[in-house]
């Protein structure tokens, strides 16, 4: 009889913990935009020019490019399933993000820009966010696919959906938080049967924000463990470069401040990356052309030392505003083989300071604009002064 009651109690616990939770409230919100774009030319060449012939390629005429004009749209739908007053499931989807009447993108596997879905999925419907929020007496917990790479000001931000878990505590004007998550997973799994051990990229974040009546200031530390390139050359070159590849560890430190000083609105932020890229395996078997093709200088360990800075000020003079912006992003010195001063940090995809250069909207909808001798305009600001 005792065994019967024990089995019955066990079955009851299993049912209790596996029961579905019904939402007591569902909230919808979202945004829709439709826009048009016109370019008088689809590259940044002022005049046509000729690329001289080489021993292997004929001469090529590069003109200014044709003009283009088109319309595009996107519906972004946010849904909150409120299970209880302290428990919420949040989902976000982008619907029909496409140019009107344009060809559809072929199905693929690579995620779209700032999306958890592919470009072809975004042209139909792609879910980017899905996470649960639990507000407890000791703080708030979040787990699932959430927005990451966003901190402080718009400078340096790229709103990327990533799987992560976080804890947040607010006391007075101070908010503290810790997070951990995954940028990339290349370890062996059902979708990657040829993956290697511990071949992924993870991050661990701790931050604090203090707010007052006329502003706020914050400080964030983000440790990144990047093992994506472990055995990268060994898997391509075989025994010649057995297990050859590299990993890198980096710590990003970024303080920011926003303040209103009378008629002056001031904001500033700094990003500093410090770390090391370490080689492993039989690096002597990697030929120089293979290194060059991967954009690498050598097989010696490299120190990461990169800096970006941003300051913006606006003065309210009543009838009009006066202001200015300054930004700096360090670039890599090709003569320092043991140090990388640029290439990781950038201005971010959320920061679009110009209509043509460093404008993610232009790049996403019109593509990269070709320049002189194979160069092109597109992507985030890197290796630059801006003002």
Residue ranges and their predicted role:
Residues 6-145, 165-172, 211-213, 224, ...:
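Beta-barrel outer-membrane channel/assembly domains of diderm bacteria
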Residues 140-220, 224-231:
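Internal, well-ordered domain-core segments that constitute the primary functional module
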Residues 223, 227-245, 250:
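Charge-patterned, long linear interaction tracts outside catalytic cores
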Residues 332-362:
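A surface-exposed, glycine/aromatic-enriched loop/edge motif typical of exported proteins
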């Amino acid at each position: 009889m005792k065994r019967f009651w024990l089995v019955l109690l066990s079955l009851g616990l299993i049912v209790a913990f596996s029961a579905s939770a019904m939402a007591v409230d569902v909230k919808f919100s979202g945004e829709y935009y439709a826009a048009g774009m016109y370019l008088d030319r689809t590259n940044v060449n002022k005049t046509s020019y000729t690329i001289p012939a080489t021993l292997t390629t004929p001469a090529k005429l590069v003109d200014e490019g044709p003009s283009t004009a088109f319309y595009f749209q996107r519906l972004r739908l946010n849904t909150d399933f409120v299970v209880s007053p302290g428990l919420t499931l949040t989902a976000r989807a982008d619907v029909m993000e496409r140019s009107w009447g344009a060809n559809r993108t072929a199905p693929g596997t690579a995620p779209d820009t700032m999306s958890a879905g592919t470009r072809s999925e975004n042209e139909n419907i792609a879910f980017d966010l899905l996470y649960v929020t639990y507000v407890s007496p000791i703080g708030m917990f979040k787990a699932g696919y959430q927005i990451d790479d966003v901190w402080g000001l718009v400078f340096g931000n790229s709103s990327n959906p990533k799987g992560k878990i976080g804890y947040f505590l607010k006391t007075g004007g101070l908010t503290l938080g810790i997070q951990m998550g995954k940028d990339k997973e290349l370890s062996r799994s059902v979708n990657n049967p040829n993956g290697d051990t511990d071949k992924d990229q993870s991050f661990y974040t701790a931050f604090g924000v203090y707010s007052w009546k006329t502003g706020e200031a914050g400080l964030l530390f983000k440790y990144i463990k990047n093992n994506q390139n472990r055995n990268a050359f060994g898997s391509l070159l075989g025994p010649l470069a057995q297990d050859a590849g590299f990993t890198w560890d980096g710590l990003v430190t970024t303080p920011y401040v926003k303040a209103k000083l009378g008629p002056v609105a001031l904001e500033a932020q700094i990003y500093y990356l410090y770390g090391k890229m370490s080689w492993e395996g039989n690096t002597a078997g990697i030929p120089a052309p293979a290194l060059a093709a991967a954009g690498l200088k050598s097989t010696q360990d490299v120190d990461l030392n990169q800096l970006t800075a941003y300051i913006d000020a606006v003065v309210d003079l009543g009838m009009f505003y006066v202001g200015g912006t300054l930004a700096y992003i360090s670039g890599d010195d090709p003569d320092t083989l043991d140090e990388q001063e640029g290439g990781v940090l950038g201005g971010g995809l959320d920061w679009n300071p110009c209509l043509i250069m460093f404008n993610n909207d232009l790049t996403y909808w019109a593509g990269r604009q070709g320049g002189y001798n194979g160069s092109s305009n597109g992507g985030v600001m890197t290796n630059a002064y801006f003002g």
